[in-house]
Structures are given as C-alpha cells and as structure tokens.
C-alpha cells in the first residue's frame, strides 16, 4: 500500500507490535513533503499454522516535525487456503464440493425506531446453507464477515457427503444508519472453490 506525506515537513512512520506471521516493511521510513512511500505486508501461512480467514489490526504512528504524533490502525485481512497444486485429477474427482444456497442475502428495507412491528431483541436475521455435494468430508475452516454490524452463528465445521449446514446471519438495524453492503467469506477445502463470497445488503 502507498502512503504520501501531504504536509510541509518531513514525516517519520513507526509501526506498533507486528504479529509473528507478518513481515512488514516501510520504505522509506521518513517521507519528505509530497513524497510517496510504500508499506509492504507479507503473510507467512506456514508460520500462521492455521487455515481460514485471518484479520488483524496493525498499529501505525506518524510523527511530523514540530507536530503531535498521529496514530491509527491498518486492518489486514487474508484468506488462507489449502495448497491444491499437487492434487491429481483423480483426487479432485473424489474431493468435497461446497454448494451454497445463494451468493446474495438481501434484507431489504430495515425497520426503524418508529416501526409499528417490534423487533425481537432489536435484531433481524436471515440464513444461508452450505451442502457438501462431493464424495469426501467438507471442512469449513471459517465463515466470517469483516463488518462488525453482521453477526454469524450456527453451522458446522465438517460436513459429510450429502450433509447440509445452516448458518444464521443477524443484523442490528439501529447500527445501520443508511445502508449496508458487506461480504461473508467462506473458506473451505473444496479444491474447485476454496473461497466463497456471499454479499449481504440492507438499507434504511
């Protein structure tokens, strides 16, 4: 990612504690006015030792000459999958197959505070299903959403051939001011589609 010094003095970039599975480099560490630098982030999946979606916050501090230090965070997210490069055609023929009931979950117009219909616990919910249409067990490493306004529950971590799991998606309308457009990431061991995306939409 790029970073630019839009001020009139030099700016030095400092990083906070970096997770052990990340290698982060800032070049250059000190930017001159209007200079563009780069922050390079590399993730080592072998060091991480787990599969699925990984999200973390990287603290960053910027110190400009004669000014108060400014701090913030960079959100880093990645999907870690199996290495399918050595699978033969026969292996793939026996592999699990993840089938989703849909790739779009539309909640439509959300009720507001003045709505006549009361909300149960102030929430609305919907569901989607994942079915294993393959010949071997389907492992679901993670089902996540980076948007904190979306809660996920239910489902299973492993599905036998022919089995189906139901996942519940819950929204809190009071936290959505105008509209919501978010993605649910499904990471699994289906070699033909290890990462599946489900779009969630809602509006006021």
Residue map of PLM features:
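Long, low-complexity ectodomains and other extracytoplasmic segments of secretory-pathway proteins
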Residues: 4-9, 63-129, 133-134, 190-204
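Short structured motifs
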Residues: 23-28, 40-44, 100-115, 125, ...
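Short, solvent-exposed loop/turn segments enriched in Ser/Thr/Gly
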Residues: 37, 46-59, 71-73, 119-127, ...
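C-terminal soluble interaction/assembly domains
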Residues: 126-133, 141-145, 151-187, 195, ...
């Amino acid at each position: 990612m790029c970073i630019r010094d839009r001020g009139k003095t030099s700016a030095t970039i400092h990083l906070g504690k970096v997770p052990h599975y990340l290698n982060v480099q800032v070049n250059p560490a000190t930017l001159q006015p209007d200079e563009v630098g780069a922050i390079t982030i590399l993730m080592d999946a072998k060091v991480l030792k787990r599969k699925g979606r990984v999200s973390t916050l990287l603290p960053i501090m910027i110190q400009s000459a004669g000014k108060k230090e400014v701090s913030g965070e960079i959100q880093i997210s990645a999907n870690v999958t199996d290495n399918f490069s050595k699978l033969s055609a026969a292996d793939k023929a026996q592999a699990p197959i993840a089938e989703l009931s849909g790739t779009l979950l539309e909640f439509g117009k959300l009720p507001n505070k003045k709505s006549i219909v009361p909300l149960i616990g102030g929430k609305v919910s919907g569901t989607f299903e994942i079915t294993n249409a393959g010949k071997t067990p389907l492992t679901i490493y993670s089902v996540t959403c980076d948007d904190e306004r979306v809660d996920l529950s239910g489902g299973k971590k492993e599905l036998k051939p022919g089995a189906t799991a139901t996942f519940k998606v819950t929204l809190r309308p009071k936290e959505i001011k105008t509209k919501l457009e978010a993605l649910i990431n499904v990471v699994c061991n289906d070699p033909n589609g290890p990462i599946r995306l489900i779009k969630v939409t809602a509006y006021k």
